[in-house]
Amino acid sequence: VIAALSAWHEQHDAASTALRTVRALPAHVLIEAYSMLTRLPSGLAVAPALAAEVLAGRFGERTLGLPDDERDRLISALADAGVLGGASYDGLVALEARAHGATLLTLDERARSTYRRLGADCSVIA
């Protein structure tokens, strides 16, 4: 998301093209994007209101969250799949996408194995 929104990012063109038709994000991805946009280094950070406006304008207001029953089993699902540490956040993203039948687009090759272990469809942006 940050790469798609940031012309200075080395993967901007590929990410922007790949995310062109995306209109909803897993809730955790949306929060991470907002967090990053408002804390980027070297004067690149934007005001909170602008970050919210950009994200809503680009990806809409729809977020993909976990249904109640899956939220109640979140930690068990991560443990059963052998997901641990920081990869737990990737696991949350995977479960949110899977619950809505969405395919994850990523530049993060490392996260791909977590997404797959939890049954989420994913594609690496090239």
Predicted features and spans:
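Short, structured coil segments at secondary-structure junctions
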Residues: 59, 100, 118-120
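Short, well-structured N-terminal submotif of metal-dependent ribonuclease cores
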Residues: 1-26, 40-53
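Aromatic- and histidine-enriched alpha-helix N-cap/loop-to-helix transition segments
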Residues: 25-28, 92
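Histidine- and aromatic-rich ligand-binding microenvironments
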Residues: 25-26, 85-87, 108, 123-126
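Active-site-proximal, substrate-binding regions of enzyme catalytic domains
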Residues: 9, 34-81
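Short loop/helix-cap segments at secondary-structure boundaries that form the rim of catalytic
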Residues: 112-118
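A generic structural signal for short hydrophobic patches within well-formed alpha-helices
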Residues: 1, 30, 111-112
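Active-site neighborhoods of divalent-metal-dependent phosphate/nucleic-acid chemistry enzymes
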Residues: 61-110
